[in-house]
Amino acid sequence: MSLSSELPGLTARLDRLCYHHGGASLPSDKPHAFVYYITIRNASACTVTLLGRKWVVEQVDGDRLVIEGDKIVGETPRLTPGEEFSYNSFHVTGVDAVVHGSFHGIDEAGRKVHVKLPPFEMAIPREGRDPAVRTCGG
């Protein structure tokens, strides 16, 4: 079994995080939706195919949710040197949380690679607190 390694030049970043509260589409115990916009950039010298992702959501109440799966929003992006893949998705919660994420794939030689997304906070907006999150429109 070969281990995955970080590929120099392959980066992931959170471009934007916005917040939406309530509505009929959200469960009553998780009325807070965070929409995240992410870009994965391949500045390495080789082509990379992304195959899946892993998220670890650490909630302030002590619960830890691990989300793993094949594909990224239903896709397996193939990134040649200099290309980017951007997407958005969301997470619903009842409490504040910190998210750790990574994406895994293979390079053109078939080696397993991964890239880590820097951790980010899903902080529910409250009076007197100025979290680094925007309220989503509509």
Model feature map: region roles:
Residues P31-Y37, V98-H100:
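Short, solvent-exposed loop/turn segments enriched in Ser/Thr/Gly
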Residues L65-D96:
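Intrinsically disordered, low-complexity Pro/Gly/Ser/Thr-rich segments with frequent PxxP/GP/PP motifs
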Residues M1-P31, P131-V133:
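Low-complexity, acidic Ser/Thr/Pro/Gly-rich terminal tails and inter-domain linkers that flank the onset
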Residues H91-G138:
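Terminal connector regions
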Residues T39-S44:
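Asparagine-centered strand-capping/turn motif at beta-strand->loop junctions
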Residues C46-L65:
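Short acidic, flexible loop segments centered on an aromatic residue
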Residues Q59-G62, G74-E84, M122-A132:
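Short, surface-exposed linear segments at secondary-structure transitions and domain or protein termini
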